[in-house]
Amino acid sequence: MTRIDDTFRRLRAEGKKAFVAYIMAGDPDLETSLEVMKGLPGAGVDIIELGMPFTDPMADGPTIQTAGQRALEGGQTLARTLAMVREFRRGDASTPIVMMGYYNPIHARGVDRFLAEAQEAGIDGLIVVDLPPEEDAELCLPAQAAGLNFIRLATPTTDDRRLPKVLQNTSGFVYYVSITGITGAAAAQAVDVAPEVARLKAATDLPVIVGFGITSPEAARDIAGVADGCVVGSAIVKLVAEGRPVAEVLDRVAALAAGAHAA
């Protein structure tokens, strides 16, 4: 039973949906992003998605791409991202952390080394957007053997023939990408998302969390209402990009979390 499993079990008992927040590690700098990260649980965040900056983030829209560039220019590395998690864990042993990014930095570090470090740091799960199920032996299976959840993306174009393959070795939760395209590009609509979530729920017992295109507390409430929870990323990263004070960023996160929890 992982921290992710425990969190969903607790939320179900409370009759609440999950609010997942994404931030980019090291954006705009290590200190600020760590301060934001430490404040997320107090703002109502149930699960933290921590972006690993990468030079070629093909699935990310301009907001998150630019955040990754800022982080890399500020000296953020995979080692520093792991150090961020270790520091966070000194004050929080219960909030799940999912690292999200691309395979290249993990491969460069060495899968076995990375997984050992991730486990030691207190990482609970991975989302690696450019590793399809056909390559599960690369990272997915070793990650699960190391006790980490491996979370997969399902999209509007994941048809019923493809879906069993996507779900086969998925654990923790399923991340449903509500719109086709890059992050932050359009607004998700609950009326469109609901039947897709139902299709996923018919195929898996895992929680289904919806992300991409959620920018307001009202949207968080509406989308979480037809799923097991929602993810907000670009809307939070945009506040950091605008140089808003950490307290203001966290106030906005709290409003988004309250929206999801009102579903």
Curated annotation (Swiss-Prot):
Keywords: Amino-acid biosynthesis, Aromatic amino acid biosynthesis, Lyase, Tryptophan biosynthesis
GO cellular component: cytosol
Protein name (record): Tryptophan synthase alpha chain
Any single Pfam family the record assigns to this protein: Trp_syntA
Membrane spanning stretches: none
Family named by the database record: Belongs to the TrpA family.
Active site per UniProt: 49, 60
SUPFAM superfamilies in the cross-refs: Ribulose-phoshate binding barrel
Keyword Acyltransferase: no
Function: The alpha subunit is responsible for the aldol cleavage of indoleglycerol phosphate to indole and glyceraldehyde 3-phosphate.
Gene3D superfamilies: Aldolase class I
EC number(s) given by UniProt: 4.2.1.20
Broad class of enzyme this protein falls into: lyase
Subunit structure: Tetramer of two alpha and two beta chains.
Pathway connected to this protein: Amino-acid biosynthesis; L-tryptophan biosynthesis; L-tryptophan from chorismate: step 5/5
Domain of life: Bacteria
Reactions listed under catalytic activity: (1S,2R)-1-C-(indol-3-yl)glycerol 3-phosphate + L-serine = D-glyceraldehyde 3-phosphate + L-tryptophan + H2O
MF terms (GO), sorted A to Z: tryptophan synthase activity
